[in-house]
Amino acid sequence: MGAAPGRRGPRLLRPPPPLLLLLLLLRPPPAALTLDPGLLPGDFAADEAGARLFASSYNSSAEQVLFRSTAASWAHDTNITAENARRQEEEALLSQEFAEAWGKKAKELYDPVWQNFTDPELRRIIGAVRTLGPANLPLAKRQQYNSLLSNMSQIYSTGKVCFPNKTASCWSLDPDLNNILASSRSYAMLLFAWEGWHNAVGIPLKPLYQEFTALSNEAYRQDGFSDTGAYWRSWYDSPTFEEDLERIYHQLEPLYLNLHAYVRRVLHRRYGDRYINLRGPIPAHLLGNMWAQSWESIYDMVVPFPDKPNLDVTSTMVQKGWNATHMFRVAEEFFTSLGLLPMPPEFWAESMLEKPEDGREVVCHASAWDFYNRKDFRIKQCTQVTMDQLSTVHHEMGHVQYYLQYKDQPVSLRRANPGFHEAIGDVLALSVSTPAHLHKIGLLDHVTNDTESDINYLLKMALEKIAFLPFGYLVDQWRWGVFSGRTPSSRYNFDWWYLRTKYQGICPPVVRNETHFDAGAKFHIPSVTPYIRYFVSFVLQFQFHQALCMEAGHQGPLHQCDIYQSTRAGAKLRAVLQAGCSRPWQEVLKDMVASDALDAQPLLDYFQPVTQWLQEQNERNGEVLGWPEYQWRPPLPNNYPEGIDLVTDEAEASRFVEEYDRSFQAVWNEYAEANWNYNTNITTEASKILLQKNMQIANHTLTYGNWARRFDVSNFQNATSKRIIKKVQDLQRAVLPVKELEEYNQILLDMETIYSVANVCRVDGSCLQLEPDLTNLMATSRKYDELLWVWTSWRDKVGRAILPYFPKYVEFTNKAARLNGYVDAGDSWRSMYETPTLEQDLERLFQELQPLYLNLHAYVGRALHRHYGAQHINLEGPIPAHLLGNMWAQTWSNIYDLVAPFPSASTMDATEAMIKQGWTPRRMFEEADKFFISLGLLPVPPEFWNKSMLEKPTDGREVVCHASAWDFYNGKDFRIKQCTTVNMEDLVVVHHEMGHIQYFMQYKDLPVALREGANPGFHEAIGDVLALSVSTPKHLHSINLLSSEGGGYEHDINFLMKMALDKIAFIPFSYLVDEWRWRVFDGSITKENYNQEWWSLRLKYQGLCPPAPRSQGDFDPGAKFHIPSSVPYIRYFVSFIIQFQFHEALCKAAGHTGPLHTCDIYQSKEAGKRLADAMKLGYSKPWPEAMKVITGQPNMSASAMMNYFKPLMDWLLTENGRHGEKLGWPQYTWTPNSARSEGSLPDSGRVNFLGMNLDAQQARVGQWVLLFLGVALLLASLGLTQRLFSIRYQSLRQPHHGPQFGSEVELRHS
């Protein structure tokens, strides 16, 4: 019985349960049956004539015994049961008893004389019969030996590997694990299959293999061999066998090294640096085969010229309806076309050509069987319809053809040099696999014989033939070491992997130790099948192929030869087969190839074209041949083994990305239209439609997000696909159950509606909306009580109404974040910046800017004190929040008239000129468009002018006035919604919004998932960068909004003060909004303390206090648009930092010289190009790369902002020093209502604390907290005073490394 080469072995198994394994090991040996006396040897003369009669008698008896033994083994291997195992062992014992009786008789009669017989055939027969092997053992040990073989076979053949945490899904080696190793490209899935099989089979086999080794050696030593390995090598009748093999291996090694280097490079492209070291061994599970012995299953990854016709005809076989029987008929027809024998009827009647579907456990490893009755020959194979298996079919049928040809030889001569037996079928497979032959049998449409097609074909063959050579060589190197004792059981695994790394250049993909027995995971080890035969075969088959091609009259390269239908070649092959082992194999080989030695030259000739090609490729890539970093090992994948079922096929991922992109544009366009309709006409009907579209979006997000979650992108080489899929995997709110999602959407809509339609009414019945009424009053009124009424009324109307919704909103937002794998919603929001140190980086930036803010705060406080008096302003306390010209005290530019450093200098505000010149909102947008165009950037499209809402409607519609820019995802429809007022402040906002539109237009050709800013702050910064130029007196003069460019020192300080009231005043507010929200999300701020903690942060960072008592019934954060609209706010802090970095870099590009605050990049194409190049990246790269495009470095830094405001900082230091200002607010408990806050409120049992109406206990806790803050602020103030006066004499341009972000207008595109 010839086994198919190990290269065609099985896949993954689960170890037997401990109880089953124990039963296997403890199963009592079968009772010894008695051999039929008629089968025992009689009396023969002790001479050559007697030996001839002895041999004849032995032959007839042996046929009967071997038939029974083989039939029992067949029954067991095609139906593994305890009963069949028992019968197999019984027959093995009988066979061994027969061998013992005849062997001992042969030794007794002929040992003194047999080597002198004149008949060489007779010498060979007697020599074979007298070798008893296991029959030398005493009965008990013989029974133990047979049980070991049966149990090892059973462990291997019934093993399973089970999917983690799923007991129902278990894989057998064939076909399951073999298919996974061949077809999966998932690193983790391959690792799980590989590790599972090696653990499931190897570990339980180790103790059995130790026992087997001892018994086998004991048996063969009694036949005169030093160990079992010596007996196996004796079959090759060559005293220099080992030296010859080593010589041949070294002759072939350069070809293997070049193939290894080429394949390693391709795997590196697929799996990256993490898993492939270009100077190290290849992880053993990545080569398409459980044992990395043949690599043809990864041909699709390494094919040199992928545009050439595919030489793997598997798909064609399937399309044409080939089945297992047809594959064997095709193979039979090849043999008969050479004039060789057809398969007998018994072959077709009795063979197992497919894996049974009746639940039987079988030994799937392909094998050919001789039943020794000269008519029954079978193949056992779990055949699958693949090209690889078509070669296996020819290989196995080669064994059967050998059986048929030598069946009339004596039993002892019905064999051959094992390498011959393995080579015959493969010789034919060399013809079958040629494109010419595949065309003949209808599996290739046409044959292309150009160089590129030849290289493709030869590389495919090399993946099978050359890749196998070191494995074919090392398996028995290891086994011979085990048999000889050089490798003790304590070093089984170490030596196994030493050899595999030394010869194959592979390494285990996971830690292995001596608990493991990885050699046992290879069929031929537990089945005790010698393996060096395959190495010999792989050399011999090319010698045979060359000889047969010459006989067939082939002309041309050896790799193109097809001996199909050559009866001359068949006749030459027949002579080899019929000889069996009746003659020395060297003689048979000489008759065949005209040489009596193994020779690798025909193999080298066959692969010469691809050898040269590989050398050229490797030289071009600077490959290191070999693996000098031989001790390198790959790390384990993240989320292993739980994530093993994820898809890692990049082609499938690309198809997903294309489909997602197509569907996204349609669905989101509809949603954007519905959202626009609602925002520009708030009605019940519009809200219903919007909610429907919201659910449609959620369904789309859920569908495609779950699809995306099937992919493991960790090893994707396509960075774009990887980035898109990772983004789509976040299901956002769509992850919520449907009912909860509907409730969540309704909460968000209700909160935004409350905010957008709110108005406050005077006593006289007149009502005012936020835009423009309340906003204008906050900006222009200087009446303390009027401002107080506006401030308080807005919060009473909006904040209090939103509070009931907010806790549930927090609950749903957190739940969605956690279901998406985040700690909480704050963690989710921060993840958009892809910066693990984001919070620390932001804090560092804030600390860098704090001195500038504290000086501005002190100066503005002094100016307000002059206007409102000591009754309302405490020079050592916080500033009342309603006096700073803005509803949220986030920007202070509207009180510039109160704080102008040099009031007599000409005004910096262009509002008056805009009104006088008849500017309209459209004119403001047209002016912004001109600015972008002057930089070489894109004009807004016609749809923008036709569809935008640039003014608040006068037809009575309720609208969301908050300015926002919109992308409708069709590449041409971009809009702005803004209740624009003709003033200087809104001119800046217009440029900000047009910056969003420009960003949309620049990245419109990217996949939709990447149509975002590099980070949220980038999107906010772009328009503000241009506004820094637009705001300069130089630019305002150029567009006729200022009478002069200014230019004097006083003008500069006035201008910088006005800019600081916008930019510097905003810094702490933009920092604290999400500080508060993140703490709400993480639970450190509870709903009972929403308002208290809000004002604690506003005091801490802004130095502000509420102008009226606040209670926990108030919800002042809710009076800020971004809170009820659930728009993250830290983007604006980031934007305000990076816009100055951008401005500084663009000014350099524009060739600006002089102070940074005087720069105007108008009409600079070079500045525009830098900006466009960064915007075109969208979200396709991490934000530091986009930062580098503009600034030449990847970090966020406050140095540009400090540089911009340095003249003002110097002036403020002088001015505050002159007045003896105390920086900060050491009297932090002061409020405008301090007189009332000293005692309890009348009849309430409550007290005023920090302007909030609290119970006594809450106030006491607050006092302790503020005491601590006061001490901290006092110390900080002392430190800052020293630091600030030193700053005057130092450059404020300090290097900084950190993140970036952008401005106070909502971005609606996502």
Curated annotation (Swiss-Prot):
Gene3D superfamilies: 1.10.1370.30
Binding site for chloride 1: 236, 533
Compartments it resides in: Cell membrane; Cytoplasm
Outcome reported for the amino acid change (mutating residue 809 to F): No effect on activity. 20-fold reduction in catalytic efficiency
Residues engaged in binding Zn(2+) 1: 395, 399, 422
EC number(s) per entry: 3.4.15.1
GO MF entries: calmodulin binding; carboxypeptidase activity; chloride ion binding; metal ion binding; metallodipeptidase activity; metalloendopeptidase activity; peptidase activity; peptidyl-dipeptidase activity
Keywords (A to Z) from UniProt: Calmodulin-binding, Carboxypeptidase, Cell membrane, Cytoplasm, Disulfide bond, Glycoprotein, Hydrolase, Membrane, Metal-binding, Metalloprotease, Phosphoprotein, Protease, Repeat, Secreted, Signal, Transmembrane, Transmembrane helix, Zinc
Entry's cofactor comment: Binds 2 Zn(2+) ions per subunit.
Identification of the protein by name: Angiotensin-converting enzyme
Highest classification ranks of the organism: Eukaryota, Metazoa, Chordata, Craniata, Vertebrata
